[in-house]
Amino acid sequence: MTQMTSSDVPGMGRRQFMNLLTFGSVTGVALGSLYPVVKYFIPPRASGSGGGTSAKDELGNSVTASGWLANHSDGDRSLVQGLKGDPTYLIVEGDDAIGSYGINAICTHLGCVVPWNSGVNKFVCPCHGSQYNSTGKVVRGPAPLSLALANIAVENDNVFVSQWTETDFRTGEKPWWT
């Protein structure tokens, strides 16, 4: 086996070296300037130990259980910003508890936000009249499916929303939204 001597190895020319240096510099600057742009489009996430997203009120502040329960009574269903920024209903159960599930407020027919109508104890879609019972199960179309569910957890007085992957307790079937 023979070794190559330095005279046998072709050297890098000045032009090739400058091209390589220029390419490396431009690539480094481009990647460095791209980082804040990508970071801008990824929303900040406050998460609990269960991997959920912090529920936000209409002003974008994190929801605390004590503050929520002080302003909402038993049976109340009010909107917070949940998973992916979707409007999600928090349910107050009793005088001192937030329900273990939330209801996504997006109608399964055409995507309208469905308001809670406490007078008839239903969610009634203003767009085409779909109706859902107090748990979000569709009771009158044209909506084809029940409203999606989300897990709600309270940790250290902070309210977290996470993806519902269990069986849908309203239908006994696998959730359609997972």
Swiss-Prot record:
Cellular compartment(s): Cellular thylakoid membrane
Other comments on record: The Rieske iron-sulfur protein is a high potential 2Fe-2S protein.
UniProt KW Lipid biosynthesis keyword: no
NCBIfam families (alphabetical): Cytb6fFeSPetC, PRK13474.1
Cofactor(s) required for function per UniProt: [2Fe-2S] cluster
Species whose genome carries this gene: Prochlorococcus marinus (strain MIT 9313)
Record-linked InterPro entries: Cyt_b6_f_Rieske, Rieske_2Fe-2S, Rieske_2Fe-2S_sf, Rieske_Fe-S_prot, Rieske_Fe-S_prot_C
Binding site for [2Fe-2S] cluster: 107, 109, 125, 128
Annotated HAMAP family: Cytb6_f_Rieske
Protein EC: 7.1.1.6
Pfam families from the UniProt entry: Rieske (PF00355), TM_PetC (PF25471)
Keyword line: 2Fe-2S, Disulfide bond, Electron transport, Iron, Iron-sulfur, Membrane, Metal-binding, Thylakoid, Translocase, Transmembrane, Transmembrane helix, Transport
GO MF term list: 2 iron, 2 sulfur cluster binding; electron transporter, transferring electrons within cytochrome b6/f complex of photosystem II activity; metal ion binding; monooxygenase activity; oxidoreductase activity, acting on paired donors, with incorporation or reduction of molecular oxygen; plastoquinol--plastocyanin reductase activity
Topology within the bilayer: Single-pass membrane protein
Cysteines engaged in disulfide bonds, as pairs: 112-127
Its biological purpose: Component of the cytochrome b6-f complex, which mediates electron transfer between photosystem II (PSII) and photosystem I (PSI), cyclic electron flow around PSI, and state transitions.
Name this polypeptide is given: Cytochrome b6-f complex iron-sulfur subunit
Designated gene of the protein: petC
One BP term from GO: photosynthesis
EC category: translocase
Subunit annotation: The 4 large subunits of the cytochrome b6-f complex are cytochrome b6, subunit IV (17 kDa polypeptide, PetD), cytochrome f and the Rieske protein, while the 4 small subunits are PetG, PetL, PetM and PetN. The complex functions as a dimer.
Residue ranges constituting the Rieske domain according to the UniProt record: 68-161
Phylogenetic placement of the source organism: Bacteria, Bacillati, Cyanobacteriota, Cyanophyceae, Synechococcales
Co-factor: note: Binds 1 [2Fe-2S] cluster per subunit.
Residue ranges crossing the lipid bilayer per the database entry: 20-42
